[in-house]
Design a protein with these regions (language model features):
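Short amphipathic alpha-helical segments, especially helix-boundary/capping motifs
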Residues: 6, 21-25, 52-58, 77-80, ...
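Short secondary-structure boundary micro-motifs
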Residues: 6-7, 15, 101, 151-153, ...
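Serine-dependent carboxylesterase/thioesterase catalytic core
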Residues: 29-35, 40-42, 46, 50-65, ...
């Protein structure tokens, strides 16, 4: 399924100028965008550019390639969040794949700072990296990962409900992670939005971008679940809810 990523990228680049005029505009609140495993800021540059055009104060993470939770990456994210908080008081965080797991944990540690979390193909219901197609590569870098996190085993508390509003954007045709590992439990401030596409193309998937722009346009304290406009409702097939396995 991931072979379709080139088509998603081409569609995004072709439609981006027109999309700017159709998407909801922001309020200037800082938005931090975290890349997926083995990716860096270059992978999120198209999305960040579009969001900047919508009036958001968008930031990449500036920590190079995401090779997993090293001490440098953990400390760098803490410093970046503190820096953004000092400027404005609250931020939105978008995390792609592994970046979404980071985003959720930042929100757990500092819920007073994070306005909301939006994840793209992030398998936060998994129990370990071996349940994805990049598990071998992740485990090969284990010696560089920090002792401050429980890797490769992901603790059960990491899969618990979030203290801030959260939107999980996922695809049933994801070729890297299992889609049901990307689902929030049913809560008033948690939602799951399915789009049609690939894992590696999610940040440039037009339907996903529409969801992101809609979520970021909400004012602080006024979070509501996503409701697609009637004209594009066909882009959003399902809205699944995570069901914990029986004991």
């Amino acid at each position: 399924m991931e072979v379709r990523v080139a088509a998603e990228v081409a569609s995004f680049l072709a439609s981006a100028p027109a999309m700017i005029g159709l998407l909801k505009r922001g309020h200037g609140r800082p938005v931090l965008v975290l890349p997926g495993f083995l990716a860096g800021d270059g992978s999120t540059a198209p999305l960040r550019g579009l969001l900047r055009g919508l009036g958001h104060d968008v930031h990449g993470w500036g920590l190079g390639r995401n090779i997993g939770p090293t001490d440098e990456i953990l400390d760098g994210m803490i410093h970046l969040v503190d820096e953004l908080r000092a400027r404005t008081g609250s931020i939105d965080i978008i995390g792609w794949s592994l970046g979404g797991l980071y985003a959720r944990e930042v929100a757990r540690l500092a819920p007073e700072v994070v306005h909301q979390v939006i994840t793209l193909g992030s398998p936060f219901q998994t129990t370990g990296p071996e349940q994805s197609r990049v598990g071998l590569a992740f485990n090969a870098l284990h010696d560089r990962h920090s002792d401050r996190v429980m890797i490769p085993r992901i603790p059960s508390w990491a899969r618990e409900p979030m203290p801030v509003p959260t939107t999980s954007i996922y695809s049933r045709t994801d070729g890297i992670v299992r889609w049901h590992h990307c689902l929030n439990r049913h809560l008033p401030t948690a939602e799951n939005v399915e789009v049609r596409g690939t894992h590696c193309g999610l940040a440039m998937n037009p339907a996903a971008v529409l969801v992101i722009a809609d979520r970021l346009a909400q004012k602080a304290g006024r979070w509501r679940p996503f409701r697609p406009p009637l004209a594009v409702r066909g882009l959003f097939p399902h809205s699944d809810v995570y069901e914990p396995p029986a004991a």
